[in-house]
């Protein structure tokens, strides 16, 4: 059977750390959607390992790792990460695989991404989406319009050449003249095809066979539910299904196989890019949280937007994903605050609303209702058991559980693997 780890906010919740730790209990770790717009940073023995494509479970040398069919893969980035693993002495051979059905992100897609952002912003950031400019949206657009290329197409040279040439021609028609050496790119991808061969498998068959063999599969979600193409704050979303449904379409598995849904929740809220953010704090509180939590994007390096925890968002994402347990991360970052707040409800025109609104105009007019909590003003990094937490921290955790209706089983109190409290009695 399978378990899935999903972000419950706007990304950057700390999913990679939990995947790294829990992967020790699984035979297979798989990513189902997204591409190099994901950024997971894992700290092991004081050393940082940043991954954008390869699942965080690669650090478990007993687990196979899959880049699933729902992903979009930029091969230069993939090979750079593989080299990084090799340089760090991490064994990946024979256990890192790429789906033959995954779509390819070309440098062309990244160029188009940047041009579209510039087109939207028109010199300002008011209308831009705030993408990572990694070519993710344009690649998914090529996929949806049936003009993209998949990993398996690398091994059909004539088809690859014809489709790739047509793809470039179509982009020239849309964006005008821009420099792009088609022949050089085709030659480069001929070389990539040979380099990639040892990694390519039919991942759909592989995963379903793994289930038949009684193996345990951990699905590593990328981005987050509030960036989901359907359920996020459209159009300020990613281009894939980053909620639980994406696991089935992005891996080719039955919903019945997914039995545990773990929502990862940062103890406050962060966001990269444009779009609404109801609990955002553009003041000394936001600045202090950003500094204490080192809130800068793994993929972009941009300073993240900061706000208090939003329980309305958490109830919404929990409803969509049917979370069975939560992982509360970065609780230690709140240790310096005298007062901590949670946004518990939204009011629209004076009335409390029951659900997260689809309309961004409605959302912009919502007033956040806050509850305040006393801080604990002490270092939590040494805490290894729930009972060792100060009462103020326990009360904060308890209130989140009450507001969302899901138990918090894992609590992060630092960046290292060892800084994770596990409430085993709740599992």
Swiss-Prot record:
Binding site for IMP: 12-15, 37-40, 132, 146, 223, 238, 302
Location within or outside the cell: Cytoplasm
GO biological process, one term: IMP metabolic process
Positions that bind substrate: 298-304
PROSITE patterns xref list: ADENYLOSUCCIN_SYN_1, ADENYLOSUCCIN_SYN_2
Cofactor: binding comment: Binds 1 Mg(2+) ion per subunit.
EC numbers, comma separated: 6.3.4.4
Cofactor list: Mg(2+)
Active site (catalytic residues): 12 (proton acceptor), 40 (proton donor)
Pfam families: Adenylsucc_synt
Residues bound to GTP: 11-17, 39-41, 304, 330-332, 412-414
Catalytic activity reported: IMP + L-aspartate + GTP = N(6)-(1,2-dicarboxyethyl)-AMP + GDP + phosphate + 2 H(+)
HAMAP family the record matches: Adenylosucc_synth
Family: Belongs to the adenylosuccinate synthetase family.
Task performed by this protein: Plays an important role in the de novo pathway and in the salvage pathway of purine nucleotide biosynthesis. Catalyzes the first committed step in the biosynthesis of AMP from IMP.
Record's protein name: Adenylosuccinate synthetase
Annotated organism of origin: Dictyostelium discoideum (Social amoeba)
Encoding gene, per UniProt annotation: purA
